[in-house]
Structure formats: structure tokens, C-alpha cells
């Protein structure tokens, strides 16, 4: 056989194989596509590539992370996703930034203050990855007032007028006085109690990003991130699962919370979910 005969086998180019057709030209009411009978080798090669991309996106989207895609491939996949209205798993993922109860200095627990950059950056991450919502958890009335003012400025005020992209991100922001309130918000939105998952830099989590992705297929998930020195034990104990720490093999893994959120969302959802 020809040396190139295996070039288009499944997995050979990091993609699943395109469908094959043979005689008769119509079998069980399925005709051979016109392009394959055209004799135009360029069109045939393009059709085969697009079919491989489409099949991989539908069946094994995880393979696209390592596939050598061209700019044309990426544009085709974007158009395919938009045309199909493909369900993005991110719609079932919700995150919450917990300001109470969290560890402060000297292993005491209490409440932390809102950080403007955290709210901005996590809202933008949430919109970029297509999350269902982003809830800021704080019981402090003055902090709630600050958050309400911030959200109003970027959604209804001059901030939203001058920066529509930021307004779109801030449209996902919600507020709750405690974690139970955040759970209630997701349940009211989705009609289901979310799976509650925690995150921690300490070595008390074993759940993988793939396990979270599997849950998102048919369940809402609320992913908690702590401020200060991490969430208090009573919050983590109430979780249905805890993700294993980022950089868990290294001794130093003290990431800023907005960095941890961005990395975690990317590991769970990647480019295709």
C-alpha cells in the first residue's frame, strides 16, 4: 500500500477520522455526498478535514487541546459551535468568592473585605468561560453596599456605557450573605440544588478537573473560592467534594485568588466546553 495510506486514520493527526463512503451511491437512503463524487481533490480534502474536525468536536473535544490546528481549522470550529448552538458545559458551572468565614492571620477566622480587582477579573473570567453566574459572598453590610455600587456603575451607569464588554461580564455578578445564599441563588436559577465543590491550597482535596467536567453534563455545580488564607473548615466540610490543589506537587502554591480562579476554570472547561 501507499506510505500515506495511514495518514488519515483516527488519531493520526490528533483528530478522529472522517466518514467513509463506498458503492452503492445511495445506501439505506443515505447518499454519497456530492463533493466526494466531484473529482475535485482540493474540495474533497477540505470536506474530509472539516468532517474530522466536526466529529472530534462532537465525540472527543478533549483531543482538540493537543491537535495541530490551523487558523482555518479554528475558524471552522468556531463557526460550527455557533451554528449548532452547542451546549457549553460552562453554563452549568457557577462560582462564588467567599469572604466569610475565612482564615485571617494567626489561624483566626473572620471576614475579609472586597477587593475591586478580584470582582472585575473574576467576572471577566466567568464571562469568558461561559459560566452561569458569579456570586460574591459577604455578610458585611458596608461591603454589600460597595458591591452594589460597583455592579450598578458597570451595568447601568457610565461604566457600562463606555465599556459594554465589562458590562456584559458584570451582568453575571450576584451577591449573597453566606454560602447557603449562594446555593439558593443557583437553585433558583437552574431548578436543581448544585453540587457544592470547594477549592483549597492545602492538601485536603483529591477531585480532578475531569471529574468536575463529568458532573457538568447534567448537573449545576457551584465552585467555591476563598479569600484571606482560605475558607474555614466548616465551609469545606459542607462541600460535596474538594478539588486537588493547583501545583500540588510543589511546596509553594500561594496563588492570588483571581489567578487560581482563572487556572481552575481553564483546567475544567478548556477551549471547547
Predicted region positions:
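Short Gly/Pro-enriched loop/turn and capping motifs at secondary-structure junctions
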Residues: 27, 40-43, 202-205, 228-231, ...
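Non-catalytic terminal and connector segments of soluble metabolic enzymes
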Residues: 1-84
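Structured adenosyl-cofactor binding patch, chiefly the S-adenosyl-L-methionine
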Residues: 1, 229-273
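Long, charge-patterned amphipathic alpha-helical coiled-coil/hairpin "stalk" segments used as oligomerization
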Residues: 197-235
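Short, well-ordered alpha-helix to beta-strand connector turns
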Residues: 131, 193, 219, 239-240
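Solvent-exposed alpha-helices and their adjacent loops that cap or buttress functional pockets
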Residues: 28, 86-90, 189-190, 213-217, ...
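Fold-independent oxyanion-binding glycine-rich loops
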Residues: 39, 98-100, 179, 199-202, ...
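RNA substrate-binding interface of SAM-dependent RNA methyltransferases
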Residues: 88-200, 262-273
